[in-house]
UniProtKB/Swiss-Prot annotation:
Keyword rRNA-binding listed: no
Region described as Disordered: 1-25
PANTHER family named in the record: EUKARYOTIC TRANSLATION INITIATION FACTOR 3 SUBUNIT F, EUKARYOTIC TRANSLATION INITIATION FACTOR 3 SUBUNIT F-RELATED
Annotated source species: Cryptococcus neoformans var. neoformans serotype D (strain JEC21 / ATCC MYA-565) (Filobasidiella neoformans)
BP GO terms, sorted: formation of cytoplasmic translation initiation complex; translational initiation
All copies of domain MPN, residue ranges: 27-165
Residue stretches of biased makeup (Polar residues): 1-10
Keywords: Cytoplasm, Initiation factor, Protein biosynthesis
One Gene Ontology molecular-function label: metallopeptidase activity
Primary location recorded for the protein, binned into one broad class: cytoplasm
Residue ranges, compositional bias (Low complexity): 12-25
Organism phylogeny: Eukaryota, Fungi, Dikarya, Basidiomycota, Agaricomycotina
Name assigned to this protein: Eukaryotic translation initiation factor 3 subunit F
Role: Component of the eukaryotic translation initiation factor 3 (eIF-3) complex, which is involved in protein synthesis of a specialized repertoire of mRNAs and, together with other initiation factors, stimulates binding of mRNA and methionyl-tRNAi to the 40S ribosome. The eIF-3 complex specifically targets and initiates translation of a subset of mRNAs involved in cell proliferation.
Length: 303
């Protein structure tokens, strides 16, 4: 499932000079990563000078480095004041060490930002994360949090930076788009469908007794239909169906008790419920009594 919005960019596969330095040609993202980025942006303070939030992307690379699989991420505090950028590196290192102690095998593969596209400061942050992913190039994800419901993707784009010219300065680089796709297991499809489904209209709550009455009426109607079917089969007016007969046999086989036994079971269940309620109230009384006795013993012990 592709996450890129419609774009006229051409993805070129240039011949690399070294296989370890070759930029990736495909980025796969787990759905939880996008959810974490959106959650991070929703908690962003409106009074902050930074209009976006950034964080580190954790994942793995393929053997040839052509595919980057992003499995998790975490927020990295930073500040932007014009061309001045400050990233909390100690916090980032503490998070990496903490995740490593908990058995996480993912490594930093790049960073994300909650903005529509890249800007001049993105090159500086890209250079910072390139030192973390060395010798591999760092990938960059931009998430458009203000995208409208146009049905053209989720506004997630992938980028890698390439040097431009002979100088090695961060300003002399260009961001090249990389295709991004979402990757999930079959067991996670149900949760994704539930999250992306339209919000259902809430139905007014019905009182308990009318709801029970409607349920019993529907059950009685179904029983009448089954009875009419059985009578028509016995009379020979309708051809019997083996599947329906099997379902009726399985349903009736669960209720082998007679009317007296059913009534006795209901009474026994009611008696058990009353017994449990009585014992719970008795225990509650004992606990309250023990607490009051302990309060009375404290002044005597002090004297």
């Amino acid at each position: 499932m592709s996450l890129d919005t419609s774009s006229s960019a051409i993805h070129l596969q240039l011949p690399p000079t070294s296989s370890s330095l070759r930029p990736p040609s495909q980025i796969t993202v787990h759905p939880s990563v996008i959810a974490q980025i959106l959650t991070h942006h929703s908690r962003h303070s409106a009074d902050s000078e930074s209009t976006r939030v950034i964080g580190a992307l954790m994942g793995n690379r393929s053997d040839n480095g052509q595919e980057v699989d992003i499995r998790s991420c975490f927020a990295v505090p930073h500040t932007e004041q014009g061309q001045q950028i400050s990233v909390d590196r100690p916090f980032q290192q503490d998070m990496v060490n903490f995740l490593a102690k908990n058995g996480t095998k993912e490594v930093i593969v790049g960073w994300y930002a909650s903005q529509k596209t890249v800007n001049s400061n993105s090159a500086i942050i890209q250079e910072y994360f390139s030192f973390e992913t060395n010798p591999y190039p760092a990938v960059h994800l931009t998430v458009d949090t203000d995208i409208e419901e146009s049905g053209k993707g989720l506004g997630v784009k992938g980028w890698v930076s390439q040097p431009l010219g002979l100088t090695s300065k961060s300003e002399c680089s260009v961001f090249v788009p990389v295709p991004v796709s979402i990757k999930y297991a079959d067991s996670e499809r149900a949760a994704l469908d539930l999250l992306t489904a339209p919000q259902p209209t809430p139905s007014p709550a019905l009182p308990p007794l009318p709801t029970l009455s409607n349920s019993l009426s529907q059950l009685s109607s179904l029983i009448d239909q089954c009875l009419a079917y059985v009578q028509s089969v016995n009379n020979g007016s309708q051809t019997p169906d083996v599947e329906i007969g099997r379902y009726l046999l399985e349903g009736l086989g669960r209720w082998s008790a007679s009317g007296n036994e059913d009534e006795g079971g209901v009474k026994a269940g009611l008696q058990d419920t009353l017994t449990v309620e009585y014992l719970s109230s008795l225990v509650r009384s004992q606990v309250e009594l023990a607490g009051r006795l302990s309060l009375l013993q404290q002044p005597v012990a002090q004297q």
